[in-house]
UniProtKB/Swiss-Prot annotation:
GO terms for molecular function: mRNA 3'-UTR binding; phosphatidylinositol-3-phosphate binding; ubiquitin binding. It is found in: Cytoplasm; Endosome. This is Vacuolar protein-sorting-associated protein 36. Residues 162-198 form a coiled coil. GO terms for cellular component: endosome; ESCRT II complex; late endosome membrane. CDD domains: PH-GRAM-like_Eap45. Belongs to the VPS36 family. It comes from the Eukaryota. Residues 105-138 form the GLUE C-terminal domain. The lineage of its organism: Eukaryota, Metazoa, Chordata, Craniata, Vertebrata.
Amino acid sequence: MDRFSWCTGLLDIDETLVIQQRGVRLSDGEEKTKFDSGTLLLTTHRLIWRDQKNHDFCIAFPLSQIVFTEEQAGGIGKSAKIVVHLHPATPNKEPGPYQTSRYSYVKLSFREHGQIEFQRRLAEELTQRRWERLSASASPSMQMNKGPQTGRIKAVGIVGIERKLEEKRKETDKNISEAFEDLSKLMEKAKEMVELSKSIATKIKDKQGDISEDETIRFKSYLLSMGIANPVTRETHGSGTHYHMQLAKQLATMLQAPLEERGGIMSLTEVYCLVNRARGMELLSPEDLVNACKMLESLKLPIRLRVFDSGVMVIEHQSHNEEEMVASALETVSEKGSLTSEEFAKIVGMSVLLAKERLLLAENMGHLCRDDSVEGLRFYPNLFLTQS
């Protein structure tokens, strides 16, 4: 710790910040210090530690003092550390918190993680040794300002830093303004697209103009794929039962094609994602989706909500045949000898959740039996049923 010197924490003109990390504690070798919680800054020239509560409390040492670094992994109740081995303190060193130390290394404890990236960037700086090149390029101008104008160097440094900070602030303000402008334009375009979709939907409905049947189907396909079809909302259909009835009708129309592609059954989670993706900005809450799905069967719509014994909720076609589904599962398992739900899902092309429910249903009906071991749940054909 006797290599550290007091500093202001401000960067020199030719110095650049590389990375910083909060929640770092300094240790003098194996001994704890009062530098318990601060921000560690790595620049092209120095390693700076600044107290998180009192920013004027800063210490630093030059990177040229470092011999090598090593990492110490964390454990239970212990933070990961970077051990920095240092050269002996130079005789002309500026005053610091420690005059002497019996250790030739310091430990940097990272309480809030980030040590891996910090160590990588520190190793890069030690390899590139940018402080030597930057100091060499800055030395001619420093020589010009020596002698009676010594005080001017400090003034130029502070003014330069303030100017840089002001330029960065202006650039940030400009970027924020441009971002808000882009967001406003995007929202305006989104409104235009919604209005356009409503107009097209109305024309399709009224069959105005020379729109053929094929063009009508194509328009509907485009609108659905773009996710901007005219959705049922509380603003347009009120609230309560009427809203959920209209929503159920729209769901029945929209889910026909996806259900056919997925073998006539989908988990409610899949349905929720699919519906909200298609509705665009008019997002649907989980409660409204469940309430609408509960009305599907009573409204005599072609799809229905089904709840398995495990509590898993799915949407399926009214024509979905349970016996055929179980027979298909039995045939697949018999061909392979035995299957897990993951293997079955991969073969039939459905989610693992639905695959497991299908196998459990076949088991409940006596067609399959299980082997539940440390390797997982595996299903086998019920030989007692088939061989008898």
